[in-house]
């Protein structure tokens, strides 16, 4: 089966995470997610419900379980297929999250009360349409940080309000790249159609570091003992098991990769796009241009997502530059960076070299993203997000002292981006 005789380590691709921050503060060591009640998330609705229709929207409180587990529990309770359930976003497992789901129940009564230790139905109301991914205004977070000195409250309070004025760097966090932080590498290998290299990275031991306890299963792969290797991977390791099953049946490397669900391959392609975005953002943070325009930028309108070019002549014109600054200060617009693909509009002038540098950072060229068959097709993403309703206070409960930070973020934004700025990356995520 081996279509590549070499098992030598592949080209080393740098970290996909941002290496610079806006606040550049000295680290504050603390711990989050010691228990679900330390990480509260409340979904903010995008629209009002009408009160009638085939879809029952339910308010759910989810405690310490994964999104797929939530969907299965609700589907079984209501006697429907998981496909009949809609949701706006996926919430962190290690949290108490309040969110909406929709359940297609035409001509049927509303769901009865749910008696489950991890899922509670808070309310029900009917609507004509299914809830779709992205149909939320944002999320409200309340996070308790433990093992931290309460004396740091003034600094945290000051930094939170600075972030509310400047915006938060809109970085993709670790969860975007998988537990080995190699999702972008797998995406790159898909772009290059390096099928054997992809399998070596996913299943072997010559690429990105992996947990010590995975050595046996990865060595078994290198011995071409694919059927035996399957037994080492858990049922939840869907991609690994699918590829190994295909290999055990004599599939080529390409066929084994294509045996993996398209949704999983899309995840890795999105991770590649995210790594490129983070690299552009990193350069802008380093140059102190993350929250203002440079020549050739594409301005992103937060209401609606439209973009327009910011030319050198606009920045040189005092009146136009002042208007841009007013709109920036009001969080109406922000600079943007590409989620690279054939459908994306690229920057120009001073902005384009930064975007090309980011593509080179993952050892690719712009040409790789011009293929019309490339998916996802690409878009622009703002370099910053608005943080509203900031709060910081010290507290104590039966588990000891804590610092509580709270804030609202728009949809698609990560609370980890805020924590990274506030604590300088020294926060410890327990149970993650």
Task: Put a short name on every predicted segment.
Residues 2-51, 55, 63-65, 77-398, ...:
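Extended, charged/glycine-rich binding lobes that contact polyanionic ligands
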């Amino acid at each position: 089966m081996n279509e590549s005789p070499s098992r030598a380590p592949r080209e080393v691709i740098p970290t996909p995470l941002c290496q610079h921050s806006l606040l550049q503060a000295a680290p504050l060591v603390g711990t989050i997610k010691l228990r679900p009640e330390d990480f509260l998330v409340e979904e903010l609705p995008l629209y009002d419900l009408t009160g009638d229709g085939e879809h029952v929207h339910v308010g759910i409180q989810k405690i310490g379980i994964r999104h797929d587990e939530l969907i299965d529990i609700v589907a079984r309770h209501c006697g429907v297929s998981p496909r009949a359930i809609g949701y706006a976003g996926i919430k962190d497992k290690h949290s108490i999250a309040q969110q909406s789901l929709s359940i297609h129940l035409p001509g049927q009564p509303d769901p009865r009360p749910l008696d489950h230790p991890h899922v509670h139905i808070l309310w029900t109301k009917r609507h004509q349409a299914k809830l779709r991914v992205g149909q939320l205004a944002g999320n409200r977070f309340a996070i308790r940080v433990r093992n931290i000195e309460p004396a740091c409250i003034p600094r945290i309070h000051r930094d939170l309000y600075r972030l509310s004025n400047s915006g938060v760097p809109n970085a993709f966090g670790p969860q975007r790249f998988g537990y080995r932080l190699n999702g972008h590498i797998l995406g790159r290998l898909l772009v290059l159609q390096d099928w054997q290299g992809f399998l070596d990275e996913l299943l072997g031991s010559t690429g990105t570091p992996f947990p010590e306890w995975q050595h046996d299963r990865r060595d078994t792969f290198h011995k071409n003992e694919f059927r035996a290797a399957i037994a080492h991977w858990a049922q939840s390791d869907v991609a690994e098991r699918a590829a190994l099953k295909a290999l055990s049946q004599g599939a080529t490397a390409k066929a084994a990769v294509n045996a993996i669900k398209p949704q999983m391959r899309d995840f890795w392609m999105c991770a590649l796009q995210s790594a490129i975005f983070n690299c552009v953002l990193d350069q802008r943070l380093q140059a102190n241009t993350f929250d203002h325009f440079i020549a050739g930028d594409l301005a992103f309108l937060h209401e609606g997502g439209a973009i327009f070019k910011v030319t050198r002549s606009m920045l040189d014109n005092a009146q136009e530059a002042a208007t841009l600054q007013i709109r920036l200060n009001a969080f109406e617009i922000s600079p943007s960076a590409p989620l690279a693909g054939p459908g994306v509009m690229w920057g120009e002038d001073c902005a384009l070299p930064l975007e090309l540098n980011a593509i080179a950072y993952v050892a690719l060229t712009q040409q790789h993203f011009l293929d019309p068959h490339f998916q996802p097709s690409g878009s622009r993403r703002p370099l910053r997000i608005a943080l509203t309703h900031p709060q910081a206070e010290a507290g104590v409960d039966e588990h000891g002292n804590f610092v509580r930070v709270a804030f609202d973020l728009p949809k698609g934004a990560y609370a980890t981006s805020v924590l990274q700025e506030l604590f300088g990356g020294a926060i410890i995520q327990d149970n993650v």
